[in-house]
């Protein structure tokens, strides 16, 4: 890592296999979300660090856990609908990033997948989501983009 890279930050996340993407899209459709996250953008964040770390992404396809429940994350006046994941794998990879010196902007890490970035005043849907298997195809990293908008 070069000294000039330190202020770039590190973003690390996972992408899902087709069966997992199909399941998330089916949830979006059943809930009739107004502006769902597109299939190619569905992911789960591992690390959102304002400092660059030497994170090494894993590239193997594997099951990493299961869906747990729906929740709304309120942030910057928006109400994002997420599926919380029961994933010791994601928790351990987040801890790996912390050991490498990653920063984190929130008090706790909650593995999740965002289904819609803003559901407005919509109530949390009552659909059961517990226990669906979640399989990733790979992890990836990129420089942190502090200007990113959904």
Swiss-Prot record:
InterPro entries xref list: Acb1-like_C, Cyclic_Pdiesterase
This protein's record includes keyword Nucleotidyltransferase: no
Pfam families: Acb1
Active site, per annotation: 43, 45, 112, 114
Membrane among keywords: no
Binding site for 3',3'-cGAMP: 11, 73, 142, 148
Domain of life: Viruses
GO molecular function: hydrolase activity
Gene Ontology BP terms: symbiont-mediated suppression of host innate immune response
Keywords recorded for this protein, A-Z: Host-virus interaction, Hydrolase, Inhibition of host innate immune response by virus, Viral immunoevasion
Protein function: Counteracts the host CBASS antiviral defense system. Phosphodiesterase that enables metal-independent hydrolysis of the host cyclic di- and trinucleotide CBASS signals such as 3'3'-cGAMP, 3'3'cUA, and 3'3'3'-cAAA. Does not cleave cGG or cA4. Besides evasion of the CBASS system, might also enable evasion of the type III CRISPR systems that use cA3 signals.
Entry's family note: Belongs to the anti-CBASS protein Acb1 family.
Protein name: Anti-CBASS protein Acb1
Organism: Acinetobacter phage Ac42
This protein's encoding gene: 57B
